[in-house]
């Protein structure tokens, strides 16, 4: 059981951002909806303080695609600024349903492909986010 009093009285370290990769998009949306609802229901005072700037938002998800080149290689992109934020990345390495094209042939993503995408997003966020989890 979480100590709700500690979570209600604790100060945020940095604004929150959630990066749910394509393999984990649905779970990321559920986590986002829960956090939005939780913060709105528990945050009824201290919202004027500058310490709570960007604490209450309608969406904490960021778009972080990993587009693939024709050779199968990919690059990690962050489509919005994450400077100074606490970035939480979510990935489902066992999601075998995602596919990509390599030299015109359809290829299913392996756990290693998902892990490589996670490393690409971490590299893209390196030195910008306050913390990466």
State the predicted function of each range.
Residues 1-133:
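PRPP-associated nucleotide enzymes
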């Amino acid at each position: 059981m979480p100590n709700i009093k500690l979570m209600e009285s604790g100060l945020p370290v940095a604004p929150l951002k959630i990066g749910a990769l394509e393999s984990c998009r649905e779970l990321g949306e559920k986590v986002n909806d829960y956090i939005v609802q939780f913060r709105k229901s528990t945050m009824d005072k201290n919202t004027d303080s500058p310490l709570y700037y960007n604490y209450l938002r309608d969406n904490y998800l960021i778009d972080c695609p990993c587009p693939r080149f024709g050779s199968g290689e990919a690059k990690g992109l962050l489509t919005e600024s994450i400077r100074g934020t606490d970035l939480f990345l979510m990935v489902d390495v066992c999601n075998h349903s995602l596919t990509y094209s390599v030299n015109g042939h359809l290829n299913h993503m392996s756990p290693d492909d998902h892990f490589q995408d996670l490393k690409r997003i971490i590299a893209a966020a390196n030195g910008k986010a306050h913390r990466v989890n």
